[in-house]
A protein has these predicted regions:
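Terminal-region recognition feature
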Residues: 1-103, 109-285
Length: 285
């Protein structure tokens, strides 16, 4: 028996789908509300388990209507993200829009760059795509090794203080970090060229510029950096302002607020749901 929270949220989802004439799936994570409650026991990020949720929600949809993906996520696993994008594009082709009511960080930004169009508000943000390798930021590890190398060339005796730090790292770590950076950047470049920038004469140059700006830890300074609409538009991304259509804005934000109330007031920790009320909900607590 669906709760009142479910009924309200699903009604707003249906209203948005009816308004756009498109399939609509929301993907919401409760990482902002429940990460401390989970205490490391729940994966709030994009992972391979999400594929089952999307399969459940896509089944029996009219695939000719395209897809609007409403995304709210801290990011997640690169391999799961790649597989999800490949799956969605195999079903809906290039007719995918990503709507960002609030935040789509890291791997969520990668998914956004695979779409033909991003819809976001003045309050919305994407984030840097610089990846992690295990527990560590890949760019940070490479920068640290480069600093050690430089200091050793200038003052070989001075680098002894780095011994305890170096002892934590495996011999192949730097190479593995570079590979995961190349993987992340390569995916975003490929997706941009194949969809959002498809048919544009300077597509590769534009894609390289986007990747350089959102993929460089040296430029973004922090993996948690919030990248807003004006900055992202200046990079050349195809972004429509949510405020350009007052009715669309009202419907999207109604979905957002009702979903945030759901994950704040119930045990739901991740919700994947379509406009027909078909859902895949993970809970904790």
């Amino acid at each position: 028996m669906p709760s009142q929270y479910d009924l309200v949220r699903r009604e707003y989802l249906k209203q948005l789908s009816d308004y756009t004439g498109r399939n609509t799936i929301l993907y919401y994570s409760a990482w902002l509300q429940k990460s401390l409650m989970a205490n490391g026991t729940f994966d709030f990020g994009i992972n391979d388990n999400d594929k089952t949720g999307f399969m459940t929600c896509i089944y029996q949809l009219d695939k000719t209507k395209g897809l609007d993906l409403i995304l709210h996520t801290p990011g997640g696993d690169i391999s799961a993200t790649e597989s999800l994008v490949v799956y969605l594009q195999s079903i809906f082709g290039k007719d995918i829009r990503v709507i960002i009511p609030q935040m789509a960080m890291s791997a969520g930004t990668m998914i956004s760059c695979s779409a033909k169009e991003i819809i976001m508000g003045k309050h919305s943000n994407l984030g840097p795509i610089d990846p992690q390798y295990g527990m560590y930021r890949a760019h940070g590890i490479i920068e640290e090794f480069e600093n050690i190398k430089h200091e050793h060339e200038v003052n070989p005796l001075g680098t002894q203080v780095w011994g305890p730090i170096l002892s934590k790292y495996t011999p192949t770590l730097v190479g593995e970090c570079q590979k995961v950076i190349d993987w992340s950047n390569g995916l975003v470049k490929q997706w941009l060229m194949n969809n959002m920038f498809n048919g544009i004469p300077d597509a590769e140059t534009k894609a390289d510029s986007v990747v350089e700006n959102i993929g460089s830890h040296a430029l973004t300074k922090s993996h948690s950096r919030h990248l807003h609409i004006d900055y992202l538009r200046n990079l050349g991304l195809n972004i429509t302002a949510l405020e350009d259509d007052a009715e669309l804005q009202d419907k999207v934000l109604s979905i957002h607020h009702s979903t945030m109330i759901t994950i704040s007031s119930t045990k739901a920790a991740k919700i994947i749901e379509n406009q027909n009320g078909v859902s895949f909900i993970n809970t904790i607590g």
